[in-house]
């Protein structure tokens, strides 16, 4: 049953990629309305929540999506059992678990208390089928029958229960795929040993973890020739994407997903920006640029107009370009990634991650901004050498950033590091960290 359903979903999703943008949008809004009716009939939360805004069942067929109130992670946390369409019970730790089989995805907790999201087996199959579509939608390397079963090396920094780990252990294994997991907590020598003579046709993981494999490849310690390099979980910088493509001679796919919707969209090495898959989610943006999602493939735990913390730029439904789906230029970051200071006039002002990410200095490998107080931040830097010219150029660019923002009152310190800080919960390396000191 599972393999048959998987094949059918692969075919359906592949066919959608050949439709027009108008067809895709018409089908997406129709699926959105079906999900509205399903949520009303099968959950306790939505009839009460929408009713408080004067929305009744008859309105669901005609109401504009923007007239339906958004929900947030906090709404899900406070009303968890009322979102589920299947019976739940609490385990010994007090966590809700489904009485019928379902996949449980944990949020990392990097933006608050961790939360679980439930997925049906069919929903997981849809996500897995979309990865097949994603792999062959373009690029210079095709995945053919002779490449099956898939052989993958995954460079990981988080444990079980997270989306990537679950897709690997539960997804790939069901289709007899072979996977080696390299954990960021292991010595690099162990990575080399575990890789051995394994010949993967896929590499996957956070960009920061895959960059370690890239270094090992450059040093001649491993020799990998994958067809596809799939990244996700962290922003993928253009120069690193180009290095992956060149060094591994592979197509690069920048996968975008989250615990609320495991498959949102993807960027790649063969087109600019990122496409959002409208046959998986109905996507919107609010006036501040927050992405609002309604997953269309997971009726077990319906999330209707769920507002993410992610900020996006260049949202467009026109379908111009390689694919007929909604397109965004880039993900700007999250609200909590923005660093707030006091400017020269004593008023609150911010440094946005998008501005900070413009720091481009030859010899500067990677960097991280750490806010210490309202007038001080550190820049932790990994540099190719101790050449003072590198630090001099960093200072020149930072001074210009602060001058343009009228924040020349802000002080900073450049600190040479051998490694950057990871978020202990998510395993990601954030660009910005708030680490304010008391009494400063």
Positions of PLM-derived features:
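Nucleotide 5′-phosphate-binding alpha/beta core
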Residues: 1-106, 113-133, 139-145, 197, ...
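AMP-binding/adenylate-forming catalytic core of the ANL superfamily
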Residues: 203, 300, 305-406
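Active-site phosphate/pyrophosphate- and oxyanion-stabilizing loops and adjacent acidic/basic residues
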Residues: 105, 242, 356
């Amino acid at each position: 049953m599972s393999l048959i359903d998987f094949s059918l979903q692969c075919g359906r999703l592949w066919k959608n990629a050949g439709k027009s943008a108008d067809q895709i949008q018409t089908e997406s809004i129709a699926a959105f309305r079906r999900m509205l009716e399903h949520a009303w009939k099968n959950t306790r939360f939505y009839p009460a929540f929408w009713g408080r805004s004067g929305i009744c069942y008859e309105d669901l067929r005609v109401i504009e999506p923007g007239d339906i109130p958004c929900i947030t992670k906090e709404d899900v946390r406070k009303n968890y059992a009322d979102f589920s369409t299947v019976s739940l019970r609490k385990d010994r730790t007090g966590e809700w678990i489904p009485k019928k089989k379902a996949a449980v995805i944990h949020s990392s907790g990097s933006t608050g208390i961790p939360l679980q999201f439930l997925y049906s087996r069919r929903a997981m199959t849809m996500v897995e089928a979309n990865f097949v579509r994603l792999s062959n939608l373009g690029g210079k390397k095709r995945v053919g029958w002779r490449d099956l079963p898939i052989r993958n090396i995954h460079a990981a920094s988080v444990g079980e229960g997270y989306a990537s780990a679950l897709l690997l252990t539960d997804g790939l294994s069901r289709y007899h795929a072979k996977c080696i997991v390299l954990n960021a907590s292991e010595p690099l020598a162990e990575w080399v040993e575990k890789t051995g003579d394994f010949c993967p046709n896929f590499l996957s993981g956070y960009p920061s973890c895959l960059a370690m494999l890239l270094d090992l490849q450059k040093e001649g310690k491993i020799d990998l020739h994958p067809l596809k390099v799939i990244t996700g979980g962290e922003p993928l910088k253009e120069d690193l994407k180009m290095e992956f493509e060149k060094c591994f001679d592979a197509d690069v796919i920048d996968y975008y997903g989250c615990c609320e919707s495991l498959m949102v969209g993807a960027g790649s090495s063969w087109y600019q920006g990122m496409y959002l898959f409208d046959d998986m989610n109905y996507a919107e943006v609010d006036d501040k640029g927050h992405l609002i999602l309604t997953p269309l493939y997971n009726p077990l735990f319906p999330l209707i107009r769920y507002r993410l913390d992610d900020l996006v730029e260049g949202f467009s439904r026109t379908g111009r370009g390689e694919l007929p789906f909604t397109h965004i230029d880039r993900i700007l970051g999250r609200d909590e990634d923005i660093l707030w200071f006091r400017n020269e006039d004593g008023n609150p002002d911010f440094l946005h991650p998008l501005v900070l990410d413009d720091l481009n200095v030859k010899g500067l490998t990677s960097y991280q901004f750490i806010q210490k107080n309202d007038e001080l931040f550190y820049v932790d830097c990994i540099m190719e050498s101790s050449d003072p010219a590198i630090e001099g150029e960093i200072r020149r660019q930072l001074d210009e950033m602060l001058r343009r923002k009228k924040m020349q009152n802000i002080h900073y310190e450049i600190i040479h590091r051998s490694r950057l800080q990871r978020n202990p919960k998510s395993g990601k390396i954030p660009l910005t960290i708030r680490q304010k000191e008391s009494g400063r």
